[in-house]
Amino acid sequence: MLAQSHPEAILNTALHALAHEADWRAILDELPAPIYTTDAEGAVTYWNRACVALAGREPELGRDRWCVTWRIYTTAGDFMPHEQCPMAEAIKEQRIVRDSVAIAERPDGSRVAFRPYPTPLFDEAGTMTGAVNMLIDVTEEQSAVLLEQADRCRRLAGALYSRESNIVLKTMADGFERTAAGLKPDNDV
Protein backbone atom coordinates (compact mmCIF):
# COMPACT_ATOMS: atom_id res chain seq x y z
CA MET A 1 0.00 0.00 0.00
CA LEU A 2 1.44 3.37 -1.06
CA ALA A 3 0.45 5.21 2.11
CA GLN A 4 2.26 2.71 4.32
CA SER A 5 5.41 2.58 2.22
CA HIS A 6 5.88 6.34 1.74
CA PRO A 7 4.14 8.19 4.59
CA GLU A 8 6.71 11.00 4.85
CA ALA A 9 6.46 11.72 1.11
CA ILE A 10 2.67 11.96 1.37
CA LEU A 11 2.91 14.21 4.42
CA ASN A 12 5.46 16.42 2.63
CA THR A 13 3.06 16.76 -0.31
CA ALA A 14 0.32 17.83 2.11
CA LEU A 15 2.59 20.31 3.90
CA HIS A 16 3.72 21.82 0.60
CA ALA A 17 0.13 22.17 -0.60
CA LEU A 18 -0.95 23.80 2.67
CA ALA A 19 1.91 26.30 2.49
CA HIS A 20 1.97 27.10 -1.21
CA GLU A 21 -1.23 26.12 -3.02
CA ALA A 22 -4.42 28.18 -3.12
CA ASP A 23 -6.42 25.03 -3.92
CA TRP A 24 -4.76 22.85 -1.25
CA ARG A 25 -8.04 21.06 -0.45
CA ALA A 26 -8.21 19.53 -3.93
CA ILE A 27 -4.65 18.26 -3.55
CA LEU A 28 -5.25 16.79 -0.09
CA ASP A 29 -8.50 15.18 -1.29
CA GLU A 30 -6.50 13.15 -3.82
CA LEU A 31 -3.87 11.87 -1.40
CA PRO A 32 -4.10 8.14 -0.56
CA ALA A 33 -3.93 8.63 3.22
CA PRO A 34 -6.38 10.12 5.71
CA ILE A 35 -5.33 13.73 6.33
CA TYR A 36 -7.06 16.42 8.35
CA THR A 37 -6.32 19.90 9.68
CA THR A 38 -7.23 21.75 12.85
CA ASP A 39 -7.06 25.31 14.04
CA ALA A 40 -4.67 26.31 16.84
CA GLU A 41 -7.22 25.20 19.46
CA GLY A 42 -7.59 21.73 17.96
CA ALA A 43 -10.98 22.13 16.23
CA VAL A 44 -11.11 20.09 13.01
CA THR A 45 -11.26 22.49 10.05
CA TYR A 46 -10.81 20.09 7.10
CA TRP A 47 -10.68 16.35 6.39
CA ASN A 48 -10.15 14.42 3.18
CA ARG A 49 -12.27 11.53 1.93
CA ALA A 50 -9.80 8.92 3.17
CA CYS A 51 -10.57 10.02 6.76
CA VAL A 52 -14.13 8.75 6.43
CA ALA A 53 -12.95 5.28 5.40
CA LEU A 54 -10.51 5.02 8.31
CA ALA A 55 -12.73 6.63 10.97
CA GLY A 56 -15.98 5.03 9.79
CA ARG A 57 -17.75 8.38 10.09
CA GLU A 58 -17.81 11.89 8.70
CA PRO A 59 -16.01 14.23 11.07
CA GLU A 60 -17.93 17.34 12.14
CA LEU A 61 -16.05 20.49 11.20
CA GLY A 62 -15.64 22.90 14.08
CA ARG A 63 -17.23 20.45 16.51
CA ASP A 64 -14.74 17.58 16.58
CA ARG A 65 -11.55 18.42 18.43
CA TRP A 66 -8.10 16.92 18.13
CA CYS A 67 -9.06 13.88 16.06
CA VAL A 68 -11.44 12.63 13.36
CA THR A 69 -11.94 9.23 14.98
CA TRP A 70 -14.91 8.38 17.17
CA ARG A 71 -12.96 6.83 20.07
CA ILE A 72 -9.26 6.17 20.60
CA TYR A 73 -7.45 3.48 22.58
CA THR A 74 -3.84 2.74 23.38
CA THR A 75 -2.27 -0.39 21.94
CA ALA A 76 -2.73 -1.91 25.41
CA GLY A 77 -6.48 -1.42 24.99
CA ASP A 78 -6.90 1.48 27.42
CA PHE A 79 -9.30 4.29 26.50
CA MET A 80 -7.49 7.48 25.43
CA PRO A 81 -9.44 10.74 25.73
CA HIS A 82 -9.14 12.85 22.58
CA GLU A 83 -7.48 15.64 24.56
CA GLN A 84 -4.61 13.22 25.28
CA CYS A 85 -4.16 11.92 21.72
CA PRO A 86 -0.96 12.59 19.73
CA MET A 87 -2.59 15.47 17.79
CA ALA A 88 -3.57 17.19 21.04
CA GLU A 89 -0.02 16.70 22.29
CA ALA A 90 1.40 18.23 19.10
CA ILE A 91 -0.87 21.28 19.33
CA LYS A 92 -0.52 21.85 23.06
CA GLU A 93 3.26 21.47 22.96
CA GLN A 94 3.67 23.04 19.49
CA ARG A 95 5.90 20.23 18.28
CA ILE A 96 5.91 17.34 15.83
CA VAL A 97 4.89 14.01 17.41
CA ARG A 98 6.03 10.72 15.87
CA ASP A 99 6.54 7.04 16.67
CA SER A 100 3.19 6.32 18.28
CA VAL A 101 0.43 3.88 17.40
CA ALA A 102 -3.17 4.16 18.53
CA ILE A 103 -6.36 2.22 17.92
CA ALA A 104 -9.44 3.96 16.59
CA GLU A 105 -12.88 2.59 17.32
CA ARG A 106 -15.48 3.29 14.67
CA PRO A 107 -19.16 3.89 15.49
CA ASP A 108 -19.95 0.34 14.27
CA GLY A 109 -17.56 -1.06 16.92
CA SER A 110 -14.82 -2.14 14.53
CA ARG A 111 -11.29 -1.02 15.29
CA VAL A 112 -8.28 -0.03 13.22
CA ALA A 113 -4.70 0.57 14.35
CA PHE A 114 -3.05 3.68 12.96
CA ARG A 115 0.19 5.59 13.14
CA PRO A 116 -0.45 9.36 13.38
CA TYR A 117 1.82 12.08 12.01
CA PRO A 118 0.61 15.24 13.81
CA THR A 119 2.50 18.32 12.65
CA PRO A 120 1.89 21.89 13.87
CA LEU A 121 1.58 24.64 11.25
CA PHE A 122 3.21 28.04 11.76
CA ASP A 123 2.88 31.34 9.91
CA GLU A 124 5.83 33.45 8.74
CA ALA A 125 6.01 35.15 12.16
CA GLY A 126 6.36 31.78 13.92
CA THR A 127 2.85 31.79 15.39
CA MET A 128 1.14 28.41 15.39
CA THR A 129 -1.96 28.61 13.19
CA GLY A 130 -3.12 25.02 13.46
CA ALA A 131 -1.92 21.53 12.66
CA VAL A 132 -2.15 18.79 10.06
CA ASN A 133 -2.32 15.08 10.80
CA MET A 134 -1.96 12.06 8.56
CA LEU A 135 -3.16 8.65 9.77
CA ILE A 136 -1.53 5.50 8.36
CA ASP A 137 -3.40 2.21 8.79
CA VAL A 138 -1.03 -0.23 10.55
CA THR A 139 -3.70 -2.74 11.59
CA GLU A 140 -2.01 -5.82 10.14
CA GLU A 141 1.37 -4.87 11.62
CA GLN A 142 -0.16 -4.10 15.03
CA SER A 143 -2.21 -7.30 15.05
CA ALA A 144 0.97 -9.33 14.50
CA VAL A 145 2.72 -7.43 17.33
CA LEU A 146 -0.19 -8.10 19.71
CA LEU A 147 -0.28 -11.81 18.87
CA GLU A 148 3.49 -12.00 19.42
CA GLN A 149 3.06 -10.36 22.83
CA ALA A 150 0.30 -12.84 23.70
CA ASP A 151 2.53 -15.75 22.73
CA ARG A 152 5.40 -14.32 24.80
CA CYS A 153 3.12 -14.01 27.86
CA ARG A 154 1.88 -17.60 27.47
CA ARG A 155 5.44 -18.95 27.14
CA LEU A 156 6.55 -17.00 30.21
CA ALA A 157 3.53 -18.22 32.18
CA GLY A 158 4.46 -21.79 31.28
CA ALA A 159 8.00 -21.28 32.56
CA LEU A 160 7.01 -19.81 35.93
CA TYR A 161 5.94 -21.71 39.03
CA SER A 162 4.01 -18.84 40.58
CA ARG A 163 0.23 -19.30 40.33
CA GLU A 164 -0.38 -15.54 40.68
CA SER A 165 2.12 -14.70 37.95
CA ASN A 166 0.60 -17.33 35.66
CA ILE A 167 -2.87 -15.84 36.12
CA VAL A 168 -1.62 -12.32 35.38
CA LEU A 169 0.35 -13.41 32.30
CA LYS A 170 -2.51 -15.50 30.92
CA THR A 171 -4.91 -12.59 31.46
CA MET A 172 -2.50 -10.30 29.63
CA ALA A 173 -2.21 -12.81 26.77
CA ASP A 174 -6.00 -13.05 26.51
CA GLY A 175 -6.21 -9.24 26.37
CA PHE A 176 -3.60 -9.01 23.62
CA GLU A 177 -5.44 -11.67 21.61
CA ARG A 178 -8.82 -9.94 22.07
CA THR A 179 -7.36 -6.62 20.95
CA ALA A 180 -5.74 -8.23 17.90
CA ALA A 181 -8.97 -10.04 16.99
CA GLY A 182 -10.92 -6.76 17.17
CA LEU A 183 -8.71 -4.98 14.64
CA LYS A 184 -10.07 -4.77 11.10
CA PRO A 185 -7.86 -3.19 8.44
CA ASP A 186 -9.36 -0.55 6.21
CA ASN A 187 -8.78 -1.96 2.75
CA ASP A 188 -10.17 1.16 1.11
CA VAL A 189 -7.34 3.41 2.30
Task: State what each model feature region is.
Residues 15-38:
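Sensory modules in modular signal-transduction proteins
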Residues 35, 44-45:
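Conserved hydrophobic beta-strand signature of PAS-family and PAS-like sensory domains
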Residues 41-43, 53:
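PAS/PAS-like sensory domains across diverse signaling proteins
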Residues 99-103, 110-116, 132:
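PAS/PAC sensory module
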Residues 59-108:
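Terminal output helix/cap of sensory domains in signal transduction proteins
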Residues 48-52:
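N-terminal capping loop/helix in small sensory signaling domains highlighted by a polar->aromatic N-x2-3-F motif
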Residues 5, 86, 105, 116-119, 126-138:
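PAS-family sensory domains
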